[in-house]
UniProtKB/Swiss-Prot annotation:
The active site is at 109. HAMAP family: tRNA_methyltr_TrmB. Its EC number is 2.1.1.33. It comes from Mycoplasmopsis agalactiae (strain NCTC 10123 / CIP 59.7 / PG2). Residues 115-120 are annotated as: Interaction with RNA. The gene is trmB. This is tRNA (guanine-N(7)-)-methyltransferase. Catalyzes the formation of N(7)-methylguanine at position 46 (m7G46) in tRNA. Belongs to the class I-like SAM-binding methyltransferase superfamily. TrmB family. It catalyses: guanosine(46) in tRNA + S-adenosyl-L-methionine = N(7)-methylguanosine(46) in tRNA + S-adenosyl-L-homocysteine. InterPro entries: SAM-dependent_MTases_sf, tRNA_(Gua-N-7)_MeTrfase_Trmb, tRNA_methyltr_TrmB_bact. Keywords: Methyltransferase, S-adenosyl-L-methionine, Transferase, tRNA processing. Substrate binds at residues 113, 145, 183-186. One of its GO terms (molecular function) is tRNA (guanine(46)-N7)-methyltransferase activity. It holds the Pfam family Methyltransf_4.
Amino acid sequence: MRLRYDKNAEGKLEMFNYLIKQGDSKILLDDKTVLEIGMGKGEMIVELAKAHPELNFIGLEKYPTVAAKCIKKANEYNLSNFKILIDDAFKVDEIFEGQCKVIWLTFSDPWPKARHEKRRLTHPLFLEKYRKILDKDGILKFKSDNDGLYEFSLSSLQNSNWRIIDHGIDLHNSKYNENNYQTGYERKWSARGKKINYIFAQKGE
């Protein structure tokens, strides 16, 4: 179901002090920062922020109407380590400086048509941007219900000199499920019997 546009969404995020307002300088990342690119309604990142108060979490989302859906839960948890930035993922290396601990790509748009390949968040163009803002020991974490995007992402990472730590086609029956926090899409598709693909990778030399 398509969300109804909320013209006040960005104002709500700012009112509750979740919104990062960009100035002329870049936003600083460090080894205590976890970044989710395309956070959607923020179901996963909000739970992660609650579970890990020692870390700082930033959700990057293009659409304020979607991002604002996380406010109720974030307020309920009284989170002080969670912020949102409204911007386009393609500008990620222009927005941030420094290097973060983790980059999450969760249930990204698969852009299935060949002519849209460069829009996929695991295309080599994006991987080169992530390389600039991920710590040398940092991890890129990917999960998706889309098998085609999973196969594309695995190939793209390998061909772009990223080291695959682990990957698989059934996250919920893996050793990682115990510490897995689900997104809305994840709950929806796994409830219908769809297995969830995952990839964990580090940048190569």
